[in-house]
């Protein structure tokens, strides 16, 4: 257990995960072919029949857009498995597609490796197909067997995504589940349940609160309850947040005639500012269609999103770093600027509680922005100003602040 005065610090694996910042969620499965969000486990497995599935298209699109990891729904609530599991016949081995020899999880994992992005797995605890679900002991063993197959056959894995939806009030053997993950994939993040190393932000809008610290002792279980999860006693204090949101409003799986719900570039950038820009990772869902491909409109929007992030933030005017409660950035000539990005050196913990940004102009300091938590990253937008000096001042902190980087930008974007 941690002492009350012991500062929380991330593990090296958590630091690596937080530096990834952008992840792609892929909801794909039997729901895709039955126009459903939540299947009840009774759909004919043979309805799963992607005509031209290409996981390389998924991984290449993700990489080109600047996303660093991809998480696939290996099994959603309907219980249909996208790998040829030995635990149930309700899987790709029981379909005519590829004569029962297909393995979506393997193809996706290999595509991610080929493209140089990390691969993670979503495995729903709730299973609406499996008959033994009603028997807690039997289902716990069933679930562990599925988990072991994925952990031992498809790694390395960056993250195991455990969904609380449908499991409100249900107790699983989270100690065994988490021990199994750390035993076979010690570098993988555990999402939100049991003994998590990362937590859910608490909504499906991709939005973190203005003050979003990396330390937490609880998190919301699902969209369908306000109850908070009880984590295992040995859960770390450092549990950074992940924000998830679908690129098509309110729909995680692909649906016919749904292109009108595609988020605009402006909406996606607002989400970026309020997720990555508030120190969390963003997990954006893009769903393959019945061909087994990202729809053209979705892929194009994703690439536009990546291009816009690079356009705004790939070339800082200047960057400085260092310890202390005040950092000043000095330019040789005055320049227009409208954004500042601050990053703490989180390997030593999160120390800043409140700060302000000021620009030096005509011998005076003009306040540009104020904020609270910084953590991994904080994006600050302010009205365009021309200045040659910018000052970052910590107003409240624990221990001496350590600034990994303090950068200013001119994007030309009015927000």
Give the role of each language-model region.
Residues 387-389:
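Extracellular Ig-like/FN3 beta-sandwich strand-entry sites
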Residues 1-384, 393-415:
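Mature catalytic domains of secreted/periplasmic carbohydrate-active enzymes
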């Amino acid at each position: 257990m941690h002492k009350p005065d012991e500062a929380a610090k991330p593990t090296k694996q958590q630091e690596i995960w937080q530096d990834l910042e952008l992840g792609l969620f892929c909801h794909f499965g039997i729901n895709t072919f039955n126009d459903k969000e939540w299947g009840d486990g009774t759909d004919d497995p043979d309805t799963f029949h992607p005509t031209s599935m290409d996981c390389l298209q998924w991984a290449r699109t993700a990489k080109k857009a600047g996303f660093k990891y991809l998480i696939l729904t290996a099994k959603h609530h309907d219980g249909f498995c996208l790998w040829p599991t030995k635990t149930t016949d309700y899987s790709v081995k029981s379909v005519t597609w590829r004569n029962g020899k297909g393995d979506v999880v393997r193809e996706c994992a290999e595509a991610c490796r080929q493209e140089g992005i990390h691969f993670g797995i979503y495995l729903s605890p709730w299973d609406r197909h499996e008959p033994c679900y009603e028997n807690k002991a039997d289902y716990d063993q069933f679930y562990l067997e599925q988990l072991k197959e994925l952990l031992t056959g498809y790694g390395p894995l960056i993250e195991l995504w455990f969904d609380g939806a449908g499991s409100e009030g249900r107790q699983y053997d989270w100690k065994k589940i988490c021990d199994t993950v750390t035993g076979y994939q010690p570098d993988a993040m555990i999402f939100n349940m049991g003994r998590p190393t990362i937590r859910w932000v608490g909504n499906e809008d991709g939005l973190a609160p203005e003050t979003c610290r990396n330390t937490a002792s609880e998190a919301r279980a699902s969209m369908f309850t306000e109850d908070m999860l009880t984590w295992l006693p040995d859960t770390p204090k450092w549990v950074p947040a992940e924000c998830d949101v679908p690129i098509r409003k309110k729909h995680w799986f692909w649906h016919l005639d749904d292109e009108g719900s595609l988020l605009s570039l402006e909406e996606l950038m607002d989400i970026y500012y309020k997720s990555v820009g508030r120190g969390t990772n963003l997990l954006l869902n893009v769903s393959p269609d019945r061909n087994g491909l990202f729809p053209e409109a979705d892929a194009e929007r994703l690439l536009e999103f990546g291009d816009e992030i690079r356009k705004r933030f790939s070339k800082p005017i200047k960057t400085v770093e260092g310890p202390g409660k005040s950092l000043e950035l000095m330019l040789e000539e005055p320049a227009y600027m409208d954004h500042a990005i601050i990053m703490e050196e989180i390997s030593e913990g999160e120390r800043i509680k409140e700060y302000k940004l000021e620009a030096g102009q005509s011998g005076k300091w003009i306040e540009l922005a104020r904020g609270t938590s910084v953590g991994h990253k904080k994006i600050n937008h302010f009205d365009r100003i021309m200045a040659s000096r910018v000052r970052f001042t910590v107003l409240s902190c624990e221990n001496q602040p350590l600034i990994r980087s303090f950068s200013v930008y001119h994007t030309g974007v009015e927000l």
